Amino acid sequence: MGFVKVVKNKAYFKRYQVKFRRRREGKTDYYARKRLVIQDKNKYNTPKYRMIVRVTNRDIICQIAYARIEGDMIVCAAYAHELPKYGVKVGLTNYAAAYCTGLLLARRLLNRFGMDKIYEGQVEVTGDEYNVESIDGQPGAFTCYLDAGLARTTTGNKVFGALKGAVDGGLSIPHSTKRFPGYDSESKEFNAEVHRKHIMGQNVADYMRYLMEEDEDAYKKQFSQYIKNSVTPDMMEEMYKKAHAAIRENPVYEKKPKKEVKKKRWNRPKMSLAQKKDRVAQKKASFLRAQERAAES
C-alpha cells in the first residue's frame, strides 16, 4: 500500500479518539504495562509484583509495586539519595550506585516481610549470573518482574545494574546476562569480571586515572565532588564493599522527625457567644457610667 494522505475533514475530527494521558505525555508504555500488570486468571487476587527502576538526572528510584484499579500500590522503595548514609557520597547516578540502590531495595523488602535471614542472596560480589531459588519448608522466594519504563534497554544500561543488585539481595527476578556490561554480542559470551568492575565502580576509577594524566583541568571540573569528598580512584572498590556490607546490616528506612510549624494568625479570631455577651455587658456598663457622670456634673 502506498502513501495515503490523512484528510482532516469533519469525519476525521468527529471520530478522533485521544490517547491515554500518560501516553500523550510520553510517560507510560501501555503495550509493556499491559503485559506486566495482567495476572494469570487462576491466581485470583494474588498481586503481580513489578520492580520499577527509573533513572533521573540526580537520582535512581527503585520500587516494588503491584497494580490495582484505584492505582499502583507501592510496597517498598529505595532511592540513590539514601546512599550517603551508607558511605557512598558521590556518583549517585552511576552503575555502581544503581547496584547499591537495587540491593538496598531487596534487603529492605525482605526485612519487612521477615525473610531477610532466609534469603541472603549473593553476599560476595562476582558479577556472574545468579538466580534465587525457593527453599523447601520456607516461604517461597519473592518474585517480581523488571519494569524499565521507556528506558532504552541496551547492554550496560543502569536499569540492569539495579536489577543485579536486587537479585544479589535475594529477590527472584527472571533475567539473562545479555544486557549486563561484559556481554559480547558477537561472540555471545559473558565476561563476569567486566561486570564486577562496573559494580565496584572501577570503570569510573579508570577514567579518573586517565583524566588525571591527560587533562588535569577536565579532571578537576568533572570530578569536583570526588575531590571535595577526598575520594580517590584507589578508594572506590573499598567504598562500595563497605556500602554493600552496611546496607545488609541495616536496610531499614528511618523516618525523619516532623517539623513543628507554629501557625501565625494574621486576623483576629472569631469571638464566642459568651465573649460577645460579655463585650455588650461591658459596653452597657461603660455607657451607664458615662451617663451618671454627665448627670452629676
Swiss-Prot record:
The keyword Transferase appears for this protein: no
Chain intervals for the UniProt region annotation (Disordered): 253-297
N-acetylglycine: residues carrying this PTM: 2
Keywords on record: Acetylation, Cytoplasm, Diamond-Blackfan anemia, Disease variant, Isopeptide bond, Nucleus, Phosphoprotein, Ribonucleoprotein, Ribosomal protein, RNA-binding, rRNA-binding, Ubl conjugation
Disorder cited: Diamond-Blackfan anemia 6: A form of Diamond-Blackfan anemia, a congenital non-regenerative hypoplastic anemia that usually presents early in infancy. Diamond-Blackfan anemia is characterized by a moderate to severe macrocytic anemia, erythroblastopenia, and an increased risk of malignancy. 30 to 40% of Diamond-Blackfan anemia patients present with short stature and congenital anomalies, the most frequent being craniofacial (Pierre-Robin syndrome and cleft palate), thumb and urogenital anomalies.
Cross-link Glycyl lysine isopeptide (Lys-Gly) (interchain with G-Cter in SUMO1): where in chain: 220
Biological processes annotated in GO: cytoplasmic translation; negative regulation of protein neddylation; negative regulation of ubiquitin protein ligase activity; negative regulation of ubiquitin-dependent protein catabolic process; positive regulation of gene expression; positive regulation of translation; protein stabilization; regulation of signal transduction by p53 class mediator
Protein name (record): Large ribosomal subunit protein uL18
Compartment(s) where it occurs, according to its Swiss-Prot or TrEMBL record: Cytoplasm; Nucleus, Nucleolus
Job of this protein: Component of the ribosome, a large ribonucleoprotein complex responsible for the synthesis of proteins in the cell. The small ribosomal subunit (SSU) binds messenger RNAs (mRNAs) and translates the encoded message by selecting cognate aminoacyl-transfer RNA (tRNA) molecules. The large subunit (LSU) contains the ribosomal catalytic site termed the peptidyl transferase center (PTC), which catalyzes the formation of peptide bonds, thereby polymerizing the amino acids delivered by tRNAs into a polypeptide chain.
InterPro entries given in the database record: Rbsml_uL18_euk, Ribosomal_uL18_C_euk
Biased composition (Basic residues): 258-268
Lineage: Eukaryota, Metazoa, Chordata, Craniata, Vertebrata
N6-acetyllysine modifications at: 5, 48, 220
CDD domains reported for this sequence: Ribosomal_L18_L5e
Positions carrying Phosphoserine: 185, 272
Cross-link (Glycyl lysine isopeptide (Lys-Gly) (interchain with G-Cter in SUMO2)): 220
CC per GO annotation: cytoplasm; cytosol; cytosolic large ribosomal subunit; cytosolic ribosome; endoplasmic reticulum; extracellular exosome; focal adhesion; membrane
Family matches, as Pfam families: Ribosomal_L18_c, Ribosomal_L5e
GO MF annotation, one: mRNA 5'-UTR binding
UniProt main location, coarse: cytoplasm
Assembly mode: Component of the large ribosomal subunit (LSU). Part of the 5S RNP complex, which is a LSU subcomplex composed of the 5S RNA, RPL5 and RPL11. Component of a hexameric 5S RNP precursor complex, composed of 5S RNA, RRS1, RPF2/BXDC1, RPL5, RPL11 and HEATR3; this complex acts as a precursor for ribosome assembly. Interacts with isoform 1 of NVL in an ATP-dependent manner. Interacts with RRP1B. Interacts with IPO5, IPO7 and KPNB1; these interactions may be involved in RPL5 nuclear import for the assembly of ribosomal subunits.
Family from the record: Belongs to the universal ribosomal protein uL18 family.
